Amino acid sequence: MEILVVAVGILVDRLTKIWALDKLKKVQDIPIIKNFFDLTYVENRGAAWGIFSGKTLVLSAVTLLVLSAIIVYMIKYRPKSKLARISLSLVISGALGNLYDRVFYKYVVDLFSLHYKDIYYYPVFNVADICVVVGTIMIAIFIVLKDDKKDGKV
């Protein structure tokens, strides 16, 4: 199951980024829902919100370290919880997707833009980012549920 989650996440991420490089890069922006959601081509040379811009080697090294830690954890402890396994697999998938970009392009391709008119723009993101965020939220839920079980609340 974990390998399937990782593979599907990477596949969807790669396909959307290949499309963005081929089509979206030429037009830069395609409005989908007026004043709310656009497809916008961005070459992100940093991390979330552009932090660590130009630090590709550092970001790649940190990503490899985190990936290694998660994989070692999954192999060593073999979590019984399906929620834990899927959430960690999503994080692995997203990390690998963005690592691929950093290694081969020296930037991460971002394409989803959420905004409110021209007043507020959330940083442009990609499928790999979605995998990491959803996986992290699921890990938090798993931890809370696990702690509640220990306390006899669940």
From Swiss-Prot:
Protein name: Lipoprotein signal peptidase
Active-site annotation: 110, 129
Reactions that this protein is recorded to catalyse: Release of signal peptides from bacterial membrane prolipoproteins. Hydrolyzes -Xaa-Yaa-Zaa-|-(S,diacylglyceryl)Cys-, in which Xaa is hydrophobic (preferably Leu), and Yaa (Ala or Ser) and Zaa (Gly or Ala) have small, neutral side chains
EC top class named in words: hydrolase
Keywords for this protein: Aspartyl protease, Cell membrane, Hydrolase, Membrane, Protease, Transmembrane, Transmembrane helix
Function: This protein specifically catalyzes the removal of signal peptides from prolipoproteins.
Keyword check for Glycosyltransferase: no
UniProt similarity note: Belongs to the peptidase A8 family.
Metabolic or biological pathway, per its Swiss-Prot or TrEMBL entry: Protein modification; lipoprotein biosynthesis (signal peptide cleavage)
Example GO BP: proteolysis
EC numbers for this chain: 3.4.23.36
NCBIfam families found in the cross-reference section: lspA
Annotated transmembrane regions: 57-77, 86-103, 124-144
